[in-house]
């Protein structure tokens, strides 16, 4: 099995002056789950190379076993720091696509024509699309047969209540 993990390249939290990016736990936990199951994992981002990490996700109080493992695992660090360019990825080369969250995907991946086309291709091929936390926001412009892909579907993600708990309401533009 081959999984494509798509990470954000966006590092600014709207117009707040704060940094954002990938929420590290949302990369590290599934990455190790996939890898430990013998899945071939490819990591990509719009710009390729090192994606930004949301600094809050790497605070001592937010450390998880997966993050501690990541910090000791050279192969995981290399996969993360040397992401492929999203524009070079094709759905026919993978069985599924996985988008971790953090706020970053709502800016670059939701608007990226490469991301939109990739998601539409996965969906049209009957392949699994997995999105965590804020990542469902990447479906904003994804369509199926001319209608929004999410029309008539139930989608879960990070809630407005959770945003309020972390002091980010309204979500900055």
Report residues per predicted region.
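Conserved, well-structured core segments that form or line functional sites
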Residues: 129
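Extended, subdomain-level signal for the structured scaffold at the beginning of enzyme domains
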Residues: 1-125, 137-173
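Short, thiol/selenol-centered motifs that function as redox-active sites or metal-ligating centers
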Residues: 132-134
């Amino acid at each position: 099995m081959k999984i494509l993990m798509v990470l954000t390249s966006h590092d600014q939290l709207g117009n707040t002056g704060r940094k954002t990016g990938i929420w590290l736990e949302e990369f590290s936990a599934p990455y190790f789950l996939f890898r430990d199951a013998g899945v071939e994992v490819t990591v990509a981002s719009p710009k390729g190379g090192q994606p930004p990490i949301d600094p809050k996700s790497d605070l001592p109080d937010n450390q998880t076993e997966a993050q501690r493992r990541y910090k000791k695992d050279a192969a995981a660090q290399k996969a993360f720091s040397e992401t492929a360019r999203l524009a070079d990825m094709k759905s026919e080369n993978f069985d599924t696509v996985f988008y971790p969250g953090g706020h970053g995907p709502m800016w670059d991946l939701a608007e990226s024509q490469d991301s939109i086309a990739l998601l539409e291709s996965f969906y049209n091929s009957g392949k699994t699309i997995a999105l965590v936390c804020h990542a469902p926001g990447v479906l904003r412009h994804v369509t199926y047969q001319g209608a929004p892909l999410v029309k008539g579907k139930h989608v879960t993600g990070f809630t407005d209540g959770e945003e309020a708990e972390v002091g980010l309401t309204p979500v900055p533009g």
